[in-house]
Amino acid sequence: MKKTSLKLTTLLGLFLLPFTAFAEEPIQSLNKMSQAMRDLNYELAFVQTTPTNMDSFRYRHIKQGQKVYAQLVTLDGEQQEIIQRGNLVSYFQPGSRAFTINSGEIVDALPAVIRTDFSKLSQNYDFIKLGKDRIAGRFVDTIRIVPKDDFRYQYLVFLDEENGLLLRGDMLDREGKLLDQFRVVTLYIDDRLRGLTDYLNKVSVPPLLNESKQESSLAVNWKTDWLPQGFDLVSQNQDVMDGEVVENALFSDGLFTFTLYVNKADSTAATENTWKQGAYTIYSEVMGDKEITFIGQLPIAAAKRIVQGVTFLK
């Protein structure tokens, strides 16, 4: 009897093993993507598409020891360039004064999914492997990132089968409608890209932007009573616009972000306003003498619930 029980336990373990391994595979592929985007030397030409616009870029990434160099350049219209040298990111744009900020990465035009902590994200999303495809002449693994609630969007990622790099990322609404797409057209991987660092080091570093605001210690007189599970406060700040103080707070779950703005309501302001374009929702509502505005990558229903959950402290 004991032998039979032991045999059944062994067979059950063998039966369950492939399913466990398969369940772990998507997150392993996603973690491989994050590491590849951080550590490899590569050049991407890609397009960023929304329902109303399309822009093309070239992104180069080089890692020398522990220092990262990167360059993002627009390929249409007037050239705009962003250069990363270690923890300094410099912006160059025609007609505007160049400046530098303290940052360990270029975030403009690149999807947030490449910077995500997938272990944390797994608490609020499911990762589903869909199979193979082909992007930019290369075979890719396709993974769907699906929220466990109805308060955020979903993501479809296409990862290079050989090196793990992200070659396409689709942000989709709950019905599968495309909101935003990152799509690589050409990919070049070569350690000889390290020669680009000579050029990047020769470019003068523009003045460092004043970052004297103490965001972490700023106290505001309002709070959010409801947020979708997994969203945390990233930063909060105060700005002065047209002589009026505007308080803002940035929130993120690691994949999607939104900002709440609170300011004194104008006497002519509409009680409620809603605007939607692509992945972005703008929703504002007047409460007493305050106007609360949501701007971010969440559905309108979620934006409305967040705004209506803001309460003011006495």
Q: Which residues make up each language-model segment?
A:
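N-terminal mature ectodomain segment of secretory-pathway/periplasmic proteins
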Residues: 24-95, 126-133, 139, 146-154, ...
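N-terminal leader/targeting segments and the immediate start of mature chains
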Residues: 2-5, 16-67, 104, 122, ...
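Short amphipathic beta-strand/extended segments with alternating polar/hydrophobic composition
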Residues: 56-62, 82-86, 100-105, 181-184, ...
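Acidic/charged, solvent-exposed loop-and-adjacent secondary-structure segments enriched in E/D, K/R, S/T
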Residues: 91-113
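Short, solvent-exposed recognition patches
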Residues: 204-287, 301
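Gly/Pro-enriched, hydrophobic low-complexity segments
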Residues: 136-204
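Sec-dependent N-terminal signal peptides
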Residues: 7-13
